A protein has these predicted regions:
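Conserved nucleotide-cofactor-binding alpha/beta core module
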Residues: 88, 95-112
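Conserved NAD(P)+-binding/catalytic subdomain of aldehyde/semialdehyde dehydrogenases
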Residues: 12, 42-45, 49-59, 104-173
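Short beta->alpha linker loops
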Residues: 1-6, 13-17, 88-92, 116-117, ...
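Ligand-binding pocket scaffold of soluble enzyme catalytic domains
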Residues: 10-14, 18-23, 29-30, 54-57, ...
């Protein structure tokens, strides 16, 4: 039996938070352009923000809808393509989002959702040479495996280092 602490205690609050995050990250999508810096020797230096590329996103079990939407919206607004492993115990919010993605203006194949056991999927995702970065918000027990499997192609890795995230907090992202 799954612990009730994995589920959001207030589903309505989770849904409202999810909608707020979608609007927040949608507004950020056009605000990450580059800048021109004046160099001290009468020259210009151009700074461009570029997407990572193909990112693997591993979602936690806590607040499955809010965490899924927050993670994909943040990565997608930067121009990345995503391979998302949703919550292992509660994948239905992510799976239901398939229908919304298909009928929305989200470019095809920019969000790919793969459900299954995290033990099996994380190693495959980490070893894949076409994945440029891994964003792990899943269980911290996978951090060592992600590090080991990602060495061959030097992909970028971001993890929460065992910390817990309050996905429903009103902290501005």
């Amino acid at each position: 039996m799954l612990s009730s602490t994995l589920l959001c205690q207030n589903p309505l609050q989770e849904f409202d938070t999810t909608l707020e995050r979608l609007f927040t990250f949608a507004s950020w999508a056009d605000k990450f352009d580059g800048a021109v810096h004046q160099a001290p020797i009468r020259a210009n230096t151009i700074a461009l923000n570029e997407p990572v590329g193909v990112m693997g996103v591993i979602c936690p079990d806590l607040a499955p809808l809010a965490s899924f939407i927050t993670l994909i919206a943040a990565a997608l607004c930067q121009g990345n393509r995503l391979i998302v492993i949703p919550s292992e115990n509660f994948p239905l919010p992510a799976v239901d989002m398939y229908q919304i993605f298909e009928t929305s203006d989200v470019p095809g194949a920019s969000i790919n959702i793969v459900t299954g056991k995290h033990d099996e999927l994380i190693t495959t995702l980490s070893e894949h040479n076409s994945v440029d970065g891994i964003w792990n918000f899943g269980d911290s027990k996978y951090e060592t495996e992600i590090d080991r499997a990602s060495v061959s192609n030097l992909k970028q890795i971001w993890t929460i280092n065992g910390n817990k995230v309050n996905w429903i907090s009103s902290v501005s992202y």
